Structure formats: structure tokens, C-alpha cells
Amino acid sequence: MAPNPRKSHPLLKMVNNSLIDLPTPPNISAWWNFGSLLGICLATQIITGLLLAMHYTADTTLAFSSVAHTCRNVQYGWLIRNLHANGASFFFICIYLHIGRGFYYGSYLYKETWNTGVILLLTLMATAFVGYVLPWGQMSFWGATVITNLFSAIPYIGQTLVEWAWGGFSVDNPTLTRFFALHFLLPFLIAGLTLIHLTFLHESGSNNPLGVVSNCDKIPFHPYFSTKDLLGFIIMLTPLLTLALFSPNLLGDPENFTPANPLVTPPHIKPEWYFLFAYAILRSIPNKLGGVLALAASVLILFLCPFLHKSKQRTMTFRPLSQILFWVLVANLLILTWVGSQPVEHPFIIIGQLASLTYFTILLILFPLIGALENKMLNY
């Protein structure tokens, strides 16, 4: 009998072991779809981004008009741009839901997979930030100025670091050029990190909603989950296309329709919606260095999740107290997102400060406490 090239060819067998014959727990729910959805998002962003880069000019005098030219004069340029801009939003929706799933079902106990995932999140945030600067509108320019300026809070080397990042004494042409270079490079770094993420995942196999070992009961990925993922793609791509075609500027800032002007500061500088929770935490601390540290901690705290797990059960499926706390955390993040979009005045300042305090308290203190309490209640 001739060997099956799918199982013997050096390249095909890697694809086979990852996407076709991969042993998968039979009971994983739709919450396990987001990994493949993120892969689709990445592919879409790289393709649309490449097409946009062909028509973009990384120069302060031409960047804004080159984007306008793409939308007006390039065949389907408007569609490519709208898909790319809104695709970023869907990328973040998927990654936040993916992280939420991992947190709820204790997937962070696969430490290597979790840590590479957090690094992926940080890289994605960096990519989105430098990408937002490229159209060179008002919010692009001032967003770049404000966020890069935060590095000046680092003692001793801060100011030097900022000027080195800017390539001068303010955000200008060198800044735009290097941001374009970074925005082109980082998605490929994300693709590489994704392969590492998957390598670690396939070492241990997928988790499942019960959090129990399912080695005795696995089924092949194809056709069962390839079909299920296909449904997920359709469910995600439908709202993406709807948004890109019917209301492409819904999530954008109107300020970005004005070309960048260093002499006029917008009344309210704020990032895209997916960074608002972190921006709210940054603003809630009246000290610059303290704010920067809180901003960094708001994301880096994810690295601590495996060490803060005190429960004897892996998932929250059968832990009602932890479930309540989890949904309080979700609500808290939504409040932070809303506060981040509001002006810095009463009552938003105090709401932001309370929500920031609650965020760290839930993650660092309440989750471990509740986990230990549930162990006690169950006589573990």
C-alpha cells in the first residue's frame, strides 16, 4: 500500500497534525472557535494591509491625501480600507473573547500557551497603535504624541527614549516613517508567534469546558470542528461586512477626518475603543509615572493568572461564586471602556478610579480568595 502523502510528506504532515487529524476533545463549545477566528482576522488584515500599503505614502505631507486617494481613486480602495480599519476592531473583539474564555475555563494553567498568548496580545496592541497613526489625521497625530510621551515618565532615560522613538523633538516625518515600517513588520511577527502559540497548545492538547483530561475520548478535528469553525467564520464575517459596507466610520473618531495639525489640540484625545479600558486606568491615577505603571500592569497582570489560581477545580463551570466574580469583572471592564471615552471631569474621574481599583482587587485578591473559599466549602 502506497504511503499517504498527507501523513508522510514533511510539510503536509505538519498541516495534517494541526488541522486534520488533530485529536480534539468532543465537548468543546463555540467558545473554542475564537482561535481560528483570530487566524482568519490575521490573514484578512495582512491581505488588506498589503493592498493598502501599495497605495500609501509614509510622508507627513502626503499620508493623509494618499489614504483619501486610495478611497476615491483605487478600485475598491474604499472597501479595502473599511475592511482593514473595522477588521482591527473584530480582531480585538475576538482576542478579548478568546482571553475571557481562557480565563473562565482555566486555560491559563497551560502556562507556555498562555504566556505566548499574552505576548501576542501585547504585539497586537503595538501593531494597532502604530497603524492608527498612519492616516495622519488629528487623532492619529495627537494619539501618537500622548502615548509616546508616556515613556518620558521612565526615570533617567525617559526623555532620551521618547526623542529616540520620535526621531526628533516632536512627532514628525521620521516618526511616521518608522511607524509605517513597524506596522508592516509586526503582523508577520504575530504570525510567527501564532505558530509558537499553536506548537505549545498541541503539546498539551486543548482544554475543554469540564476541565478534565479527555485523552480517552478525542475525535479528529476534520470534519467535525473544521465544519464548526466554518460556521464561526460566517457568523464573524457577516457583521464585519455589514459594518464595513453600511457604517464604516461608526467606531472611528470624527477628529481623524481633519489632517494632522500640531498647532491645534483636539478637545478630547482618546484612543480607539479597544484601548479605552487601559486608557481609563492610565487616566485614573493623577501621577504620570503611576499612571504608566498602572497602564502596563492592567495588561501584564495576565501573566500572573496561573499563579493566582487557588481552586482545586480547573474551570469555573461548577464554581458559582467565581462565576459571579468573573461577570462582575466583565461589567467592570465595560464600565472602564465607557469611562475612557468620557471627558476628564466629575463624575467620570471618581468612577474611573473606583473601577480601576476594583479591576486590580478582583484579579489580585478576590479571585484567589474565592478559589480558596470554594475549596473549603467543598471540603477539598
Curated annotation (Swiss-Prot):
Subcellular location: Mitochondrion inner membrane
Listed result of changing residue 198 to P: In strain: Isolate PL05
Classification lineage: Eukaryota, Metazoa, Chordata, Craniata, Vertebrata
Residues binding heme b b566, per UniProt: 98, 197
Record keywords: Electron transport, Heme, Iron, Membrane, Metal-binding, Mitochondrion, Mitochondrion inner membrane, Respiratory chain, Transmembrane, Transmembrane helix, Transport, Ubiquinone
Annotated protein name in UniProt: Cytochrome b
TM spans (from-to): 34-54, 78-99, 114-134, 179-199, 227-247, 289-309, 321-341, 348-368
GO cellular component, as recorded: mitochondrial inner membrane; respiratory chain complex III
Record carries keyword Mitochondrion: yes
Main location: mitochondrion
Annotated organism of origin: Apus apus
One of the Pfam families matching this protein, by short name: Cytochrome_B
Family: Belongs to the cytochrome b family.
GO annotation, biological process: mitochondrial electron transport, ubiquinol to cytochrome c
Cofactor(s) for this UniProt protein: heme b
